């Protein structure tokens, strides 16, 4: 098969090229900002990246908040002590990384290290002597971490820093002492003086060993002096000393602080508020009434000491400094005490703490320096540093989680949490802390889908389909891991969850599609023939044998065969119009710029989406290609086998084997082998030397092997609705016109201004102003002036509070050291400030390190840190964000475009920016995708028209626009995920039915090599194919049912409740996509009809006859009456001009007993002329009339003599119409078989008709009887009718029961029947004076039988191939093999039926009950087998009962009667044998 014919393979090639092109382009753009490339292995590591690394970051802040659930004031000893327990737990926490234990002291940010950084450049530290490097390294390790906590106002913070930096830990300090002593001994060499310092306090060891080391002689360098280093050590030691004005948390405060507490208490007049704020008791109100803080000072101090101060809060002044061991930080806003408290439900019910951590770059620098000093070969990389940082951040969260579960936390009602730095982590379904629930939910979704599709879609081979589903998942995971990792890692976030959802949708759809494709091709009914049949009549002739009133089982059989045939026709067809256009390679080049535009302007993650979908698509292509190749190979082998069998048969007929067989001689071994080798005829030999037919290709048990009746019923209902939609005219225009209106309305909704934001209290409210200024040194004065003006305007915003601003700290430094206000500042003053106050400089550290030698670098990068005060006033926050935006615009030129980031700011600013541009982005994306889908239609939908391209593209894009409108209306997050899912689902739902319609349209319009069908004239209607539409409806129903269950579970299970609304949105996506797909089908079908009518009117003059009208009758078989959706035949444009021909096997003809009025049996009935026509009419009348005894009718339901008077025959016969028969349900026994037993009370339906004179006589007599009984019958009409209907329904046979004879089907059979229900006898009537003899028989009239119907097309006239379709019999007879012997059952069929036609009628489906049928569905019998099922089997007189007593006692009289019958039977056999002639001795006769 050429590449042009395999459209799926072409699509896979294009998809692969586009995907790898996008990956290459994105990698090129990403590498422009990459400085170095390192090899990190093929497979990535999956982890939870807590934050995305922000470039230009001085240090990382981890925020921890304590919230009192009852709204109590947390500024008390009780809650502060509880907070100290958490910090101590964090200080003791260790993380194992690459086989080594690390503590938080190893990765925390330490401002005191700036004391040494301002003295030595990194390249100069390595030039120091080894003992001095060791001294600096150990001093840096003992430096306290940057922790902003209310405990810094108390001496308790030193205890926490001591535990964190291990100042007093004996084993650590002993090891520190040995390391310093060893480095000192190495420096002095072979000397007898080996000092030893006895101390267990780390700073004292640094002080003593530094005093000894500075006495050692060393080479003088120009970069440093021992005096400078000694001063730095002294500065470091003084910076970590305890402040003198700090008190212990559990001790009474100083006397001055008591006065402040008393004053604060008196300012609160409400005792309840005072009690809540200061933690007082009920009996304290009496003491505080009339208290004077000045006169009663001593009394108040004694009272508060008695209260032990633990239950009384210590108020924090607004500017109180909680700097702890950070000296020389006066006026530094970073350590303001009010920053440590906040409010959630009540004032001061929240306590805040900040812990500074090093960035990965700083960790890498520290670890490399440590390994260098220790003499180790360092293996640290930036990736390992990032891993260590992430491990610690996760460990902090785990520790906080355990701390919340402590008994003390539960007792005092404290809830502790770690504040996320990024907004994305708040909206990522909290993956970092709830990874287990996300994983479980994903597994739950996939398990539910697998179960549903295994039971309701993959019924033929669910194990194979499930395995291929998992194989696609595995290949996708592998390819995604290799191509889409970032820094050797794949982050588990909402973006990855979206990829999994898209993969699940596509993988499920493709698995189902390939499963059905494989099963239908394997059971194709036309596998042995050469495909394709070049006439579009092949779409219709396989259901020409359907009757209008056939049961649903026959309909299902025909539809299954048609579905298989259509699949095979699309698979193996080599017609030119089904191939891709010659210019498809040039058109496919347009995919590259289209996808590139979408990637660049709309979604930068398009390469990852393509990688997720590519493996499933390629595997599906490979599977389908393998199915095609295997079946083509099988067809080729079967043809070769048929040729060999034909030669064998010719040899078999010519070598005398048939003569030997017919002569009665036993078969030879070679003959038996020959019989068994003919697999197409003989399957296996039974015990009685009878041979069973093998399963032919007509067996539809596999294609119909749905798991239960409900699936089959759903497909029938879907097909009926499909036909109902396709026949709409004006209503169809209204339907897809409404869909167009909804799409346009969605665009209008997105333009409506909506208040989209709501105040987010839990968001990180910090704002960072980032600057990058060139030539800072040369333009210092002007830039400082602009910075001063910028700070003034920032300070004017009341809701912004300063946290760190190096410009303010530098101005304070200049004010203290340079009293002259007129002095002009320069860049050297900044370097001086850095040397004088290194800790303050480090806390407010710029992003770029200052070198004393080279001065301020260019560009000079720094950040200002502020905080937005959130006071439950959203309008104030929005106003602050707007003023910040205005300020940035104002200083865009003078300060080199400062950049602002922050969670709360970005939330409000981003919402405004995103929603303002949301409409533009969606319209741009819709325009690009419409071009993409139009290109798909142009290449793959077989020469489409412009209208079809616009229809398909518009409605598929409409799904995205409608979901975008919902997102805009409700301000939903994860917009890209929902819109991508909408456009993908919309394409999958609409493409397959649309493609099938396009293919059918192209077959009809193929002018040169395809004949035109007369049923498609301008006044008639196209019957579109339905297989893909029903398949799509089934897949959609399964996915929707599974989604509803998932939504219910997500709403009930607490761990999954966060996924409830996303699941609901995905359900809405499915409904919207399905609605638009219906609009696509209706609009496309009506467009195709107009196009085909115009073409046919212009090209041909069409005739009238047709056999395709029966296609229209399928609709009325598919919708049950309870739905009340009438689809009458008259509503369809295609109408049959004559009755269709039914090719079911006719019953064997048996001569009835001749009467005196019967014609001579030797008279030729085939003689043409009037007499022959009369014979035919009489024969048809005999088939449609049956004579029943009158007592049979009286035993059932009486004839309605009031409403059916025109159909009643006078005299002893009564005629019953087919409508009445349909109500009474007994006609199944009249139509089943013509050969009835002589003992039956019903005469043979093939008996001769009654003479016309006799019928006329009875009609006249019957009129008199009608006049007498009509009055009485009218009075009881209503009551009897109700009783008749109820009785018929109550006693109707259950054909779904396999023990009841008759076909199993869903709906009431549309056949004429008479009920045998017994009803109460009528009350006695008055006997008339001249009574009319009662009727003795009933004349029943029924519909003609299939073999009684006249031919649809008169074949006495040569067929016009342009206007007349081929006959089914002609299609089958042309494949008849004349070399084969006659069929064994030829006596049951007309004489003109060949072997092929009889084989077609002798379908294994009707013959053997060995097909795979669903439960509770009985195999219907062959039409000819009704006779054998109705009569009792012959009695076996040679039967020997088994030993033992029977379970049911048999009377002796019954056994005697049986013996008498057996004796009579044996005597009769002896008489028959004695009278039979002797066999002829001649062989072969």
Swiss-Prot record:
Residues 1131-1271 are annotated as: Interaction with fem-3. Residues 1401-1422 are annotated as: MX regulatory domain. GO terms for biological process: cell differentiation; hermaphrodite germ-line sex determination; hermaphrodite somatic sex determination; sex differentiation; spermatogenesis. It is found in: Membrane. GO terms for molecular function: transmembrane signaling receptor activity. Residues 1143-1175, 1228-1252, 1275-1306, 1348-1384, 1442-1485 are annotated as: Disordered. The chain crosses the membrane at residues 438-458, 490-510, 584-604, 732-752, 923-943, 950-970, 980-1000, 1033-1053, 1063-1083, 1181-1201. Keywords: Developmental protein, Differentiation, Membrane, Receptor, Sexual differentiation, Signal, Spermatogenesis, Transmembrane, Transmembrane helix. One of its GO terms (cellular component) is membrane. Its main location: membrane. The keyword Transmembrane applies. Somatic and germline tissues. The keyword Transmembrane applies. Residues 1-28 form the signal peptide. It comes from the Eukaryota. Residues 1275-1284, 1456-1472 have a biased composition (Basic and acidic residues). It is a multi-pass membrane protein. Plays a major role in controlling sexual cell fates. Promotes female development in XX animals where it sequesters one or more of the FEM proteins to the membrane thereby freeing the tra-1 protein (a putative transcription factor) to enter the nucleus and promote female development. In XO animals it acts as a receptor for her-1 which prevents it from binding to FEM proteins thereby repressing the activity of tra-1. Negatively regulates male development when bound to fem-3 and is required together with tra-1 for promoting spermatogenesis. Interacts with tra-1 and fem-3. The MX region mediates a post-translational regulation, essential for the onset of hermaphrodite spermatogenesis. This is Sex-determining transformer protein 2. It comes from Caenorhabditis remanei. The lineage of its organism: Eukaryota, Metazoa, Ecdysozoa, Nematoda, Chromadorea. The gene is tra-2.
């Amino acid at each position: 098969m050429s590449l042009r014919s395999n459209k799926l393979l072409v699509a896979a090639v294009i998809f692969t090229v586009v995907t790898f092109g996008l990956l290459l382009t994105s990698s090129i753009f990403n590498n422009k900002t990459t400085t170095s490339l390192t090899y990190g292995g093929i497979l990535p590591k999956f982890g939870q990246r807590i934050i995305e690394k922000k470039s230009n970051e001085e240090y990382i802040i981890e925020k921890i908040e304590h919230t009192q659930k009852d709204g109590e004031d947390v500024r008390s000893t009780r809650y502060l002590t509880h907070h100290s327990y958490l910090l101590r737990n964090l200080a003791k926490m260790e993380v194992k990384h690459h086989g080594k234990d690390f503590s938080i002291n190893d990765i925390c940010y330490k401002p005191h290290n700036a004391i040494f950084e301002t003295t030595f450049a990194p390249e100069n530290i390595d030039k120091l002597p080894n003992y001095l490097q060791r001294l600096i390294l150990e001093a840096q390790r003992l430096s306290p971490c940057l922790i902003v906590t209310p405990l810094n106002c108390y001496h308790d913070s030193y205890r926490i820093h001591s535990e964190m930096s291990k100042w007093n830990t004996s084993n650590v300090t002993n090891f520190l002492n040995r390391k310093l002593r060893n480095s000192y001994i190495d420096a002095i060499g072979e000397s007898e003086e080996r000092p030893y310092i006895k101390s267990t306090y780390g700073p004292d060891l640094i002080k003593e060993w530094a005093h000894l080391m500075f006495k050692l002689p060393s080479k003088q360098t120009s970069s440093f002096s021992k005096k400078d280093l000694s001063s730095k050590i002294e500065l470091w030691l003084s910076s970590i000393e305890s402040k003198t004005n700090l008190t212990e948390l559990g001790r009474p405060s100083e006397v001055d602080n008591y006065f402040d507490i008393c004053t604060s208490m008196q300012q609160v007049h409400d005792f309840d508020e005072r009690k809540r704020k200061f933690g007082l008791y009920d009996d304290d109100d009496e003491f505080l009434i009339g208290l004077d803080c000045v006169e009663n000072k001593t009394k108040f101090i004694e009272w508060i000491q008695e209260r032990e101060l633990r239950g009384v809060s210590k108020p924090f002044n607004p500017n109180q400094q909680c700097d702890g061991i950070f000296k020389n930080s006066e006026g530094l806003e970073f350590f303001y005490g009010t920053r440590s408290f906040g409010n959630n439900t009540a004032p001061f019910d929240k306590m805040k703490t900040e812990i500074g951590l090093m960035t990965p770059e700083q960790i890498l620098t520290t670890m490399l320096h440590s390994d260098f000093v220790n003499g180790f070969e360092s293996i640290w990389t930036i990736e390992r540093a990032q891993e260590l940082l992430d491990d610690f951040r996760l460990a902090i969260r785990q520790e906080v989680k355990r701390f919340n579960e402590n008994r003390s936390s539960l007792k005092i009602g404290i809830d502790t949490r770690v504040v996320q730095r990024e907004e994305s982590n708040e909206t990522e379904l909290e993956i970092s802390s709830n990874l287990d629930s996300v994983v479980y939910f994903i597994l739950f979704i996939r398990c539910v889908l697998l179960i549903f599709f295994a039971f309701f879609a993959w019924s033929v081979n669910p194990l194979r389909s499930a395995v291929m589903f998992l194989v696609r998942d595995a290949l996708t995971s592998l390819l995604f891991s290799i191509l889409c990792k970032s820094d050797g890692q794949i982050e588990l976030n909402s973006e990855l969850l979206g990829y999994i959802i898209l993969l699940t949708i596509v993988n499920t759809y493709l698995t189902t599609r390939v499963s059905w494709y494989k099963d239908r091709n394997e059971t194709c009914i036309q596998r042995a023939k050469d495909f394709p049949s070049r006439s579009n009549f092949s779409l219709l002739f396989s259901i020409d044998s359907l009757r209008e009133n056939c049961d649903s089982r026959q309909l299902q059989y025909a539809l299954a065969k048609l579905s298989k045939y259509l699949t095979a026709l699309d698979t193996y067809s080599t017609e030119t119009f089904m191939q891709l256009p010659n210019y498809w390679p040039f058109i496919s080049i347009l995919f590259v710029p289209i996808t590139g535009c979408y990637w660049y302007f709309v979604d930068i993650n398009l390469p990852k989406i393509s990688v997720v979908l590519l493996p499933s698509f390629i595997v599906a292509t490979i599977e389908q290609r393998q199915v095609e190749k295997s079946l083509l190979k099988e067809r080729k082998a079967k043809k070769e086998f048929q040729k060999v069998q034909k030669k064998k048969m010719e040899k078999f007929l010519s070598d005398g084997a048939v003569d030997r067989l017919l002569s009665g001689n036993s078969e030879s071994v070679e003959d038996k082998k020959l019989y068994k080798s003919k697999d197409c005829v003989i399957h296996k030999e039974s015990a009685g030397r009878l041979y069973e037919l093998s399963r032919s290709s007509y067996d539809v048990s596999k294609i119909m092997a749905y798991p239960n009746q409900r699936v089959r019923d759903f497909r029938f209902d879907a097909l009926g609705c499909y036909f109902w939609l396709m026949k709409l005219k004006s209503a169809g225009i209204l339907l897809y016109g409404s869909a167009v209106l909804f799409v346009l309305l969605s665009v209008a909704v997105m333009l409506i201004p909506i208040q989209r934001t709501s105040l987010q209290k839990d968001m990180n409210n910090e704002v960072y102003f980032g600057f990058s200024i060139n030539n800072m040194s040369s333009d210092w004065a002007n830039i400082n002036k602009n910075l001063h003006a910028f700070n003034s305007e920032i300070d004017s915003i009341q809701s912004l509070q300063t946290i760190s601003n190096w410009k303010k700290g530098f101005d304070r430094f200049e004010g203290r050291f340079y009293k002259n206000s007129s002095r002009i500042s320069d860049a050297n003053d900044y370097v001086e400030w850095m040397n004088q106050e290194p800790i303050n400089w480090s806390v407010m550290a710029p992003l770029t390190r200052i070198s004393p030698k080279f001065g301020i670098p260019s560009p000079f990068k720094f950040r200002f840190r502020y905080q937005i005060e959130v006071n439950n006033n959203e309008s104030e926050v929005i106003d602050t964000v707007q003023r910040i935006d205005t300020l940035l615009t104002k200083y865009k030129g003078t300060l080199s475009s400062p950049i602002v980031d922050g969670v709360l700011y970005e939330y409000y600013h981003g919402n405004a920016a995103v929603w303002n541009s949301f409409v533009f982005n969606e319209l741009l994306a819709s325009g690009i995708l419409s071009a993409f889908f139009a290109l798909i239609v142009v290449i793959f939908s077989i020469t489409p028209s412009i209208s079809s391209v616009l229809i398909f593209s518009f409605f598929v894009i409409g799904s995205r626009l409608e979901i975008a409108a919902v997102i805009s209306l409700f301000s939903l997050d994860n917009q890209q995920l929902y819109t991508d899912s909408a456009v993908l689902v919309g394409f999958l739902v609409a493409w397959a039915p649309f493609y099938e319609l396009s293919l059918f349209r192209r077959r009809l319009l193929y002018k040169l090599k395809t004949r035109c069908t007369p049923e498609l004239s301008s006044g008639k209607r196209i019957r579109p194919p339905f297989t893909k539409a029903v398949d799509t409806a089934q897949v959609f129903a399964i996915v929707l049912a599974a989604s509803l269950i998932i939504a219910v579970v997500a709403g009930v299970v607490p761990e999954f409740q966060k996924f409830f609304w996303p699941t609901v949105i995905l359900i809405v996506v499915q409904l919207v996509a399905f609605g638009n797909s219906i609009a696509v089908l209706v609009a496309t079908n009506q467009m195709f009809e107009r196009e085909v009518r115009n073409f046919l009117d212009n090209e041909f003059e069409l005739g009238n006859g047709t056999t395709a009208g029966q296609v229209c009758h399928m609709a009325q078989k598919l919708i049950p009456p309870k739905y009340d959706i009438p689809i009458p035949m008259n509503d369809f444009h295609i109408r049959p001009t004559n009755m269709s021909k039914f090719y079911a096997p006719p019953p064997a003809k048996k001569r009835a007993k001749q009467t005196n009025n019967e014609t001579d049996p030797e008279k030729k009935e085939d003689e043409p002329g009037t007499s022959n026509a009369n014979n035919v009419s009489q024969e048809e009348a005999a088939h449609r009339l049956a004579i029943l005894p009158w007592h049979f009718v009286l035993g059932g339901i009486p004839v309605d003599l009031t409403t059916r008077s025109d159909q009643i025959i006078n005299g002893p016969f009564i005629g019953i119409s087919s409508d009445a028969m349909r109500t009474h349900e007994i006609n199944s026994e009249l139509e089943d078989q013509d050969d009835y037993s002589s003992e039956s009370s019903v005469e043979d339906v093939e008996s001769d008709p009654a003479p016309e004179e006799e019928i006329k006589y009875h009609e006249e007599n019957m009129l008199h009887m009608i006049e007498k009984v009509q009055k009485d019958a009218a009075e009881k009409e209503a009551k009897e009718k109700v009783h008749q209907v109820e009785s018929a329904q109550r006693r109707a046979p259950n054909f779904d029961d396999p023990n009841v004879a008759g076909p199993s089907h869903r709906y009431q059979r549309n056949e004429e029947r008479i009920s045998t229900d017994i009803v109460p006898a009528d009350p006695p009537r008055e006997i008339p004076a001249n009574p009319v003899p009662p009727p003795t028989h009933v004349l029943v009239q029924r519909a003609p039988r299939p073999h009684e119907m006249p031919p649809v097309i008169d074949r006495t006239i040569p067929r016009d191939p342009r206007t007349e379709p081929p006959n089914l019999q002609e299609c089958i007879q042309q494949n008849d093999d004349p070399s084969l012997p006659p069929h064994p059952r030829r006596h049951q069929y007309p004489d003109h039926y060949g072997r092929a036609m009889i084989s077609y009628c002798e379908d294994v489906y009707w013959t053997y009950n060995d097909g795979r049928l669903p439960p509770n569905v009985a195999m219907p019998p062959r039409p000819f087998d009704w006779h054998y099922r109705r009569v009792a089997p012959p009695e076996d007189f040679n039967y020997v009962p088994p030993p033992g007593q029977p379970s049911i006692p048999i009377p002796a009289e019954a056994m005697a009667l049986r013996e008498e019958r057996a004796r009579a039977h044996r005597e009769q056999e002896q008489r028959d044998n004695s009278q039979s002639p002797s066999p002829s001795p001649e062989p072969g006769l």
